[in-house]
């Protein structure tokens, strides 16, 4: 006896009429999941998980909703289950159409964040596809013939039915029948055939696969959200005769209505979709909410649910390190060739509008057209500007294009912009070094990060090829007054008779001391433009030398590629692991091929550390707790000398040691202490005066561009060029001693 028939007998017995929707609710065999508390713990404890679910699934939310159910029996645990098992999944999924209101405090926070809702006030206008007779979009293949196909789709939920976690097999079939009947009634260009997945013939299956129409059950995120329960029952595909109109039934949403065709004629595709959905609305009632718009399984699709997209050939644009950020700037979301969570094939990407909530359908498709047009125009520029570039070198936007973006930077604070004059642009536009580095490569990080101070070079040759740009910049940054400057020869001093010792014998002010230098290996390009092959070769050269160190410097090398989880956790705990999260270095090309060719070496006592292929080929670091600068400095110099026996460092009589960033030229040394100066730091003007007088640089506790609320600052020497290593360390020591003296007196 079925659940429904048993219930109806009870109904007849007590002579009560119950709505069929209530029967569905009471008889649902729901997706079984762990408790909300357990799922929250899994999400919270997974450091790979950076989802909005993790952000907003607070203890208060769990407490409030742990026993709450929707009218269809759905739970918040069902909504967040997929995030517990897929750390890369950004969003929860709604268990049914009522979940957004039942769990409103949770979902509203997620929705407002994802859709960038101003002031968190969620609202959505009435549906408006515009006047379909007067659309004015240009064909997107006008811009370089790069568009392979155009596609516009939207999702719809039929009122009265749950989503995957709360649908029974019987109601899923009922829903399928309801939708397929409406589709069979379509006429004209929409007339077609419905193919249920259950019992599908092999001939039909092969045909649908060949046409790329068949959806599958291989998405882990959708699976763990309950999207594949009872697969393939209740699911199917409708296709019109021209194969340019398609409807998926019970894939993620109840229906996905899709209009598509080859080429870039967005008007034809959009009009076909709009006419069809208006026709289907006559026989199907779609769930709509005045705040959220049309209701969908995933919060990302709320609102219009409309996703207008093209498959476009953009290999150069897609290879840029900040490709996703460029797309986001233009309101576009990039995906792989075969959809979300897939890779691109042959440089072809799916580009679609990102915004769906808070605007009309016409607004959404207009934004998509404008954004895609801008990206296609940029791809055309990239292809033209990078003709003849050496293989493996990162493509780069035209110098004039980046110079325009750089205008947003402060001409007083940004050296990159200050010296990029019209004359310099004219002189160096299109010029390359022997291995393909351009001035455009160098200024790119500043163009996209206007707070960045200095350019990044691609190889040592940049300093001679672009000398008229770099030399004035270098003189200004390093305070060098003579344009014919020459850096002194390396001088580390007598390590047994150093002019400084422990800067804080009492231990009251200095938390730790650290001295580092950058080194480039001769005949290798810098990490910003280096090829993957050379990156691996360089890592082998450096790691081989490090593994040969002895005595106090002997230790272990940890390559970032295929790093063991236990090693990764230990390096994180020790604060040794460098990451790929600096947008300035990213946009200079510093994270290309990540994590290939990179690694970390540290000695057994964890006081000597080498970063391989972060910004420079090597960052060699000596450090320890307390203020004993002499011990830290001595360890560093002895380590540098030992490594230098196995390779030749890039060095110039003019610039000293050659580094990726001009700020590190010369000694490339940064000697620093973590200094507790709460009284002095509460007087920013006085702190700045001391730093200026003693040529020091003060950074926040977490590095450059950060604050220090507790008064602990990273204090380091500012000068690196025009003085010896010994002088640089001594300069820092004298300045720190003065700061401690002032702090004591306040």
Curated annotation (Swiss-Prot):
PROSITE patterns: PHOSPHAGEN_KINASE (PS00112), PHOSPHAGEN_KINASE_C (PS51510), PHOSPHAGEN_KINASE_N (PS51509). Residues 35-116, 398-479 form the Phosphagen kinase N-terminal domain. ATP binds at residues 149-153, 212, 256, 307-311, 335-340, 512-516, 575, 619, 670-674, 699-704. Its cofactor is Mg(2+). Keywords: ATP-binding, Flavoprotein, Kinase, Magnesium, Metal-binding, Nucleotide-binding, Oxidoreductase, Repeat, Transferase. GO terms for molecular function: ATP binding; creatine kinase activity; metal ion binding; oxidoreductase activity; taurocyamine kinase activity. Approximate repeats lie at residues 31-393, 394-705. It holds the Pfam family ATP-gua_PtransN. Residues 146-382, 509-746 form the Phosphagen kinase C-terminal domain. This family of enzymes reversibly catalyzes the transfer of phosphate between ATP and various phosphogens (e.g. creatine phosphate). This is Taurocyamine kinase. It comes from Schistosoma mansoni (Blood fluke).
